[in-house]
Amino acid sequence: MKKIIFFTILYFSLFINSLNGHVQHYLNLNYLEYDLFLNNEKIGSHIFKFEKNGKNIKITSNGSFVVSKLGVKLMNYSTISEELYHDNQLVKFKSNTKQNDKVKYVILNIDKDKLNFDINGSSFNGKANSSTIVGNWWNHEIVKKNEQISPISGRIIKQNVNFLGKEVLKINEKKYTALHFHFLSNDNKPINKKK
């Protein structure tokens, strides 16, 4: 049975000038926060902070959410991560995540030839092509990729991304134009083998 990952990525016109392409297009962005909703109820948030120093960009993130039903916590998730880019190329990534009672991690470094990432993760140890993107949702380049590195465990996730169209959203009496995408994992592992 395929694991279905469904995300709606919204690019509000408010951010379009700052969020327009590769990492260098994020130079004017210092802070990005989004709330996470399930069935129209806020369950958590994710915050990204951007620090620039010459040709380096460091992105730190902190996120958490809780899914409960009838007062029982079904999912309790918290994560912190740090990404370092030099000349618009990811050179380091590390994360620590607690998902219910499981501790997960990723330590990623680019190799000396800048062709591959060396990944040490809780679910994967090995190499990935340096053009593969870490699946942190601040970088809209993810919609152009056919695979991502899990920021939770380091595993390589094959994905299909479909553009569903433009939508106009009304938030606090203000209208925003958004792009709607559907992400689907095309990983054929049985659900109990996925980490």
Regions found by a protein language model. Give the residues of each.
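Solvent-exposed helix/loop surface patches that form functional interfaces
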Residues: 27-29, 96-188
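N-terminal mature ectodomain segment of secretory-pathway/periplasmic proteins
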Residues: 28-112
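Bacterial N-terminal signal peptides
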Residues: 7-15
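Boundary at the C-terminal end of the N-terminal hydrophobic targeting segment
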Residues: 18-23
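Short, intrinsically disordered, charge-balanced linker/junction segments flanking boundaries
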Residues: 189-195
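Ordered hydrophobic segments in well-structured contexts
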Residues: 33-35, 178-182, 195
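Positively charged n-region of N-terminal signal peptides that target proteins for export
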Residues: 1-4
